[in-house]
Amino acid sequence: MYGGICLCVLLAVLAISSSGQHISRSLNGNSLAAAIEQNFPEKHRPARTPDSNQRVESNIDEKANLGVLLARYLQKARRGTNGKPPDPKKESQDYLGWMDFGRRSAEEYEYSS
């Protein structure tokens, strides 16, 4: 249950961060930014943001890191709650005799034909 909740939260954070980037990019081309640059002298201007090439590189790095984190999360989710990978032998032993149930009960009654 926690795995599903974590995945939903992760997707929500990704959606919010990507929508936030679109909003900030649309504001960069706004005439308001041009008016602010004209009104403030060079000394009082805030430091400029990195150019678009650096933004693209940082976005690629963030996506790569996110991919690594997602892969780790999926590996942990597969392992289960105890941190050990599931044992295929144990899973098959749980249902070893279920197919023989009908045959054994039929042998007990020994129907005559």
Curated annotation (Swiss-Prot):
Propeptide: 21-79, 102-113
Cystine pairings recorded for this chain: none
Gene Ontology terms for molecular function: neuropeptide hormone activity; toxin activity
Keyword annotations: Amidation, Cleavage on pair of basic residues, G-protein coupled receptor impairing toxin, Hypotensive agent, Secreted, Signal, Sulfation, Toxin
Tissues in which the protein is found: Expressed by the mandibular venom gland.
Residue segments, region Disordered: 77-97
One annotated Gene Ontology cellular component of this protein: axon
Primary location class: secreted
Modification sites for Sulfotyrosine: 95
Residues modified as Phenylalanine amide: 101
One GO BP annotation of this record: regulation of blood pressure
Superkingdom of origin organism: Eukaryota
UniProt-annotated location(s): Secreted
Pfam families: Gastrin
Signal sequence region: 1-20
Family: Belongs to the gastrin/cholecystokinin family.
Protein function: Cholecystokinin-22: hypotensive neuropeptide that binds cholecystokinin receptor type A receptor (CCKAR).
Protein's name in the database: Cholecystoxin
